[in-house]
UniProtKB/Swiss-Prot annotation:
Keywords: Autophagy, Cell membrane, Cell projection, Cilium, Cilium biogenesis/degradation, Coiled coil, Cytoplasm, Cytoplasmic vesicle, Golgi apparatus, Membrane, Phosphoprotein, Protein transport, Transport. It is a peripheral membrane protein. GO terms for cellular component: autophagosome; autophagosome membrane; centrosome; ciliary pocket membrane; cytoplasmic vesicle; cytosol; Golgi membrane; SNARE complex. Residues 76-107 form a coiled coil. GO terms for biological process: autophagosome maturation; autophagosome membrane docking; cilium assembly; protein transport. It comes from the Eukaryota. It comes from Mus musculus (Mouse). This is Synaptosomal-associated protein 29. Belongs to the SNAP-25 family. Residues 1-42 are annotated as: Disordered. One of its GO terms (molecular function) is syntaxin binding. Residues 198-260 form the t-SNARE coiled-coil homology domain.
Length: 260
């Protein structure tokens, strides 16, 4: 047998527990129609304005954080393109040097074929060969557009780090500096004079200004990378032609050596 009386409703406890839950956010449809309705409506509108201003500030801060990260990635990619250009230019110079050495070898082979020619060439002064290139760090200059974009972004990097030490949590760092008022204690003053709302508006405007500048940097980086890639494509085309020509000359020289 149950220990409860017959008239006991087991769901009464649930009702009491539900009453202890925090009240949901007021909606305009939940506002009373009594004499306090105008005051409640004003308070609701102020809360709604603050809530939306806070959400907008957080959203623009997140967008700003993503923009900073994108710019850093763009600069890193541009620097890798510059390094790649240096490798291509160095490779092209090495191929040119190999072609010169191969031409000199072909002249020696042709002179060896004739004993008389060999004696004459023996007493002739040897041609002056260019000094070998010193192997060192490869220094290459990118196109002017990309170089300017990289320098501009790097100049701004210190400013970004000083303003936002942790870019991945930029939105938290930004909003923590904004004084917040509890939603239940909104001032009865007209909200344009509200310091919290004014701070949110200033933060939103500042974020939008920085977003505009940052997007301009991203555009310059993208255009500079496009020009750099096109120029490196030209280097690759030249290098491919020279390598093909060098391969043919090597096979021809090898054939002449076997005929000696």
């Amino acid at each position: 047998m149950s220990g409860y009386p017959k008239s006991y409703n087991p769901f009464d406890d649930d009702v009491e527990e539900e009453d202890t839950r925090p009240a949901p956010w007021k909606d305009v449809r939940d506002l009373p129609d009594g004499p306090d309705a105008p005051i409640d409506r004003q308070q609701y509108l102020r809360q709604e304005v603050l809530r939306r201003a806070e959400a907008t500030a957080a959203s623009t801060s997140r967008s700003l954080s993503l923009m900073y990260e994108s710019e850093k990635i763009g600069v890193a990619s541009s620097e890798e393109l510059v390094r790649q250009r240096g490798v291509l230019e160095h490779t092209e110079k090495m191929v040119d040097k190999m072609d010169q050495d191969l031409k000199m070898s072909q002249k020696h082979i042709n002179s060896i074929k004739s004993v008389f020619g060999g004696f004459i060439n023996y007493f002739k002064s040897k041609p002056v060969e260019p000094p070998p290139e010193q192997n060192g760090s490869i220094v290459s200059q990118p196109n002017s557009r990309l170089k300017e974009a990289i320098n501009t972004s790097k100049d701004q990097e210190n400013k970004y780090q000083a303003s936002h030490p942790n870019l991945r949590r930029l939105q938290d760092a930004e909003l923590d500096s904004v004084p917040k008022e509890p939603s239940s204690t909104v001032n009865t003053e007209v909200y344009p004079k509200n310091s919290t709302l004014r701070t949110y508006h200033q933060k939103i405007d500042s974020n939008l200004d920085e977003l505009s500048v940052g997007l301009g940097h991203l555009k310059d980086i993208a255009l500079g990378m496009q020009t750099e890639i096109e120029e490196q494509d030209d280097i690759l085309d030249r290098l491919t032609t020279k390598v093909d020509k060098l391969d043919v000359n090597i096979k021809s020289t090898e054939k002449k050596v076997r005929q000696l």
